[in-house]
Amino acid sequence: MSDIAERVKKIVAEHLGVEPEKVTENASFIDDLGADSLDTVELVMAFEEAFNTEIPDDAAETILTVGDAIKFLEKNAG
């Protein structure tokens, strides 16, 4: 697992208060991890801060799963 993937999973587990083992790449923030729309906005902001990057609104709307976040950040962070 990449460093980015590990960091994303840790951020998601901490922000949503879920067990780390539930945070899989296929897990939907809303359907599987119990997030609401405010949680997803807060997650995007946490990713931006942790990875020192900006996630445009149109891109943020496509980040629906843990794997989506990892793929976006692997391509755009740093």
Swiss-Prot record:
Domain named Carrier: residues: 2-77
Post-translational modification: 4'-phosphopantetheine is transferred from CoA to a specific serine of apo-ACP by AcpS. This modification is essential for activity because fatty acids are bound in thioester linkage to the sulfhydryl of the prosthetic group.
Phosphoprotein listed as a keyword: yes
Keyword Flavoprotein: no
GO cellular component: cytosol; membrane
Principal location class: cytoplasm
GO biological process, one term: lipid A biosynthetic process
UniProt name for this protein: Acyl carrier protein
Organism this protein belongs to: Azorhizobium caulinodans (strain ATCC 43989 / DSM 5975 / JCM 20966 / LMG 6465 / NBRC 14845 / NCIMB 13405 / ORS 571)
Upper taxonomic lineage: Bacteria, Pseudomonadati, Pseudomonadota, Alphaproteobacteria, Hyphomicrobiales
Protein's gene: acpP
